[in-house]
């Protein structure tokens, strides 16, 4: 058995920074050549520990920023203003659709924060007038539901 330090998450084995014991062949032929792990030494353990500490600090800062943005988005003043104008026929169907990019643009201007369109989760583009609920995934642990009102121009 050989001790290795994981530098990537490996299903069924562990996450980044974990010290695990694996068979020598698995380490030598798979984990180390693919860059998923490094051989365990005291120096490598200290180096990975430093990297992990820096990563945890970055993740904590990203989580706090996501929570701050979520607080801004859930304020009534921001969500009340989230209205999108679109060209529509008399039956209430849009000529075209409202996409995540359109929602991100309006949400960014209403909140004052840069919201990437990849963070907007909609099942399919919105093609009807009315109120629709959209999820905004700011962080894996922070999601916000926003009501989007689409009205005819």
Curated annotation (Swiss-Prot):
Binds to the 23S rRNA. InterPro entries: Ribosomal_bL9, Ribosomal_bL9/RNase_H1_N, Ribosomal_bL9_bac/chp, Ribosomal_bL9_C, Ribosomal_bL9_C_sf, Ribosomal_bL9_N, Ribosomal_bL9_N_sf. Keywords: Ribonucleoprotein, Ribosomal protein, RNA-binding, rRNA-binding. This is Large ribosomal subunit protein bL9. PROSITE patterns: RIBOSOMAL_L9 (PS00651). One of its GO terms (cellular component) is ribosome. Belongs to the bacterial ribosomal protein bL9 family.
């Amino acid at each position: 058995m050989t001790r290795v330090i994981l530098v990537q998450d490996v299903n069924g084995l562990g996450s980044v920074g974990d010290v695990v014991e694996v068979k020598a062949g698995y380490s030598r032929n798979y984990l180390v050549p693919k860059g998923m792990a490094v051989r365990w030494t005291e120096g490598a353990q200290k180096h990975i520990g430093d990297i992990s500490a820096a990563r945890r600090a970055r993740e904590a800062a990203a989580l706090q920023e996501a929570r701050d943005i979520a607080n801004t988005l859930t304020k009534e003043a921001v969500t009340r203003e989230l209205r999108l104008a679109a060209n529509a026929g008399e039956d209430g169907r849009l000529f075209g659709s409202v996409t995540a990019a359109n929602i991100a643009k309006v949400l960014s201007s209403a909140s004052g924060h840069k919201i990437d369109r990849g963070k907007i989760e909609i099942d399919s583009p919105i093609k009807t007038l009315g109120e629709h609920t959209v999820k905004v995934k700011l962080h894996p642990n922070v999601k916000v539901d926003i009501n989007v009102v689409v009205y005819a121009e």
